[in-house]
Every structure is written in structure tokens, then in C-alpha cells.
A protein has these predicted regions:
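Conserved glycine-rich cofactor-binding loop
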Residues: 10, 17-18
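C-terminal helical subdomain
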Residues: 186, 204-240
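Active-site helix of classical SDR
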Residues: 125, 162
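Residue(s) in the substrate-gating loop at a strand-loop-helix junction
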Residues: 146
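Conserved glycine-rich Rossmann-like NAD(P)H-binding loop of the short-chain dehydrogenase/reductase
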Residues: 33-49
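Substrate-binding pocket helix/loop in short-chain dehydrogenase/reductase
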Residues: 101-102, 106-114
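Rossmann-fold scaffold of SDR-type NAD(P)-dependent oxidoreductases
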Residues: 14, 87-95, 143
Length: 273
């Protein structure tokens, strides 16, 4: 398949109000002249980004406000996105995380994570894949997983579980696609410097995090060149290769010590009630 050409084409970006989604939207508009459909919960941030990109990149931008932990919102958003039949690509980036002891994760929090990271992704993917299969149009999707989906991460147990599902789901679905002009890419970055990793619990792990501009640029490269699975960063790829050669129990144990140390330090720095 040929590379994607984004100029004057409509591309959906979920989770576009901050972090990786916001930066991908900026780069798609400024560097590739893509028209954008920005989806997230925070309308004020989406409208601000829309105004910026329409003015600076001279592209068209639509805003769709939706809470992806709510299936009614998801279905209404998909209807809105597909109604004119012009969608060319989609980046499913929205997600929530939790860093802490799994026993302290509230059930409502877990349900929100599951709905946002898994259920909404599958729901949107089902509808968009069906659209491209039925129409035969050229297009592509980039689904954001994580290196936490490749290797279980203690103290992010639920989060890494959701990302492992996304990784396995997308890798399998790639081989069911019948439209020869449509591709699926699963993107598995390590930690990224974003709003999601700005909390105290992540303070000691900041040195491991990739700058968001680099993560966005590599994600768009993987999307445009239709990679099947892509891990950004040479060190991440090399590290992932060697981690696959070592016993899983050993790797998970080492990660557990690093993450627990960061968590304990963060907890110790919090003011006592």
C-alpha cells in the first residue's frame, strides 16, 4: 500500500484536548495540512485548539465533544464523524491511567478506565472498519496502546492490562481486513511527558519519559507509512528486544522494584492529613 497523504483529508484524533492527541493534531495540521476532527470531553480546550490550527495552519477543524467512558456519547460521536462520508483516517488516542496499588483502585475508576481504554476503542474501531470495508475507500487507523501492553507493569496493573488487550486485538484484526486500501497500525510508546504523567506518583520516573513532540512525530510516521506495530524510540525498541529474551518473571520483578520505589517516594512527599 502507498503512504497516506493527509493534505486536505479529514483525520479524527481522540483525546485531542491535551498530551499526545493534542500534539498529533498540531503536527498533522502544521506539517501535513490535514483537516481535523478533534474529539475529547473538554470543549473549551478543543475550541481553543481549533481556533489556533485554523488560523496558523489554514486547515478546517471540527470539534466533537464526547465522554468516551459513556457508550451513548461514543455512538453519537461516531454518527457525527461518519455522516458526510469524508473520513480518511483516525487516531484513537484517548485513554486514562492509574499508578498505585491495585487494591486501592476504586471500582468506579476501574470501570471508567475499562470503558475509555477498551470498550470505546473497540466500539469506534468496529464502526470505522465496517465503514471502510463497506465503502472500499482508502484510509487508515492508528490505535494507541503502550509498551505497558507488551510487558506487564506492576502498580499499573489495570492500565497495562487494558493496553495488552488493545495490542492483541489490533494485531489480530489487521489480518481480518479485506479492503486492500485500508490499514490498521497499533502504536506502543513507552512513557510520555503529558498531563497524564504529571502527577506526584510519576515524579521519580520523569527521566524515563519521551518528549511528547517526539512521540507524536513517530506516531504519525508509523500511521502514514502503515506500520503494523510500532514502538517509538531506538532505546525502547532495543530495550524491548532484550527484555523479550529474559524471563518474564525477572523483568516484571525488576519493574516492580522501580515503580514501587517511585510510588513510596511520592507517597512520602505528600502532606499528612
Amino acid at each position: 500500500m502507498s503512504k497516506l497523504q493527509f493534505k486536505n483529508k479529514w483525520v479524527l484524533v481522540t483525546g485531542a484536548s491535551s498530551g499526545l492527541g493534542e500534539e498529533m493534531a498540531r503536527q498533522l495540521a502544521n506539517d501535513h495540512q490535514a483537516n481535523l476532527i478533534l474529539l475529547a470531553r473538554r470543549k473549551d480546550k478543543l475550541e481553543k485548539l481549533k481556533d489556533e490550527l485554523e488560523k496558523e495552519a489554514n486547515v478546517s477543524v471540527k470539534v466533537v465533544v464526547a465522554d468516551l467512558s459513556n457508550l451513548d456519547d461514543v455512538d453519537q460521536a461516531i454518527d457525527e464523524i461518519l455522516k458526510d462520508g469524508q473520513l480518511y483516517g483516525a487516531i484513537l488516542n484517548a485513554g486514562v491511567t492509574y499508578f498505585g496499588r491495585h487494591s486501592e483502585l476504586e471500582w468506579d475508576q476501574f470501570q471508567t478506565m475499562l470503558q475509555t481504554n477498551v470498550i470505546s476503542v473497540v466500539r469506534i474501531t468496529n464502526r470505522l472498519v465496517a465503514h471502510f470495508e463497506d465503502t472500499g475507500h482508502e484510509g487508515a487507523m492508528l490505535i494507541v496502546s503502550s509498551m505497558a501492553g507488551l510487558f506487564p507493569v506492576p502498580f499499573q496493573s489495570a492500565y497495562s492490562g487494558t493496553k495488552a488487550f488493545i495490542l492483541s486485538f489490533t494485531r489480530a484484526l489487521v489480518h481480518e481486513i479485506r479492503n486492500p486500501s485500508f490499514s490498521l497500525t497499533v502504536y506502543a510508546p513507552g512513557g510520555i511527558v503529558t498531563e497524564m504523567t504529571a502527577g506526584e506518583n510519576f515524579h521519580d520516573l520523569q527521566g524515563w519519559l519521551m518528549p511528547v513532540k517526539q512521540a507524536a512525530k513517530e506516531g504519525i510516521y508509523a500511521f502514514q507509512t502503515r506500520k503494523s506495530t510500532y514502538v517509538p524510540g531506538v532505546l525502547n525498541r532495543v530495550g524491548g528486544f532484550f527484555m523479550n529474551l529474559l524471563p518474564r518473571k525477572f523483568i516484571t520483578g525488576k519493574m516492580s522494584k522501580v515503580y514501587e520505589r517511585a510510588l513510596v517516594k511520592a507517597e512520602g512527599s505528600k502532606p499528612k492529613p
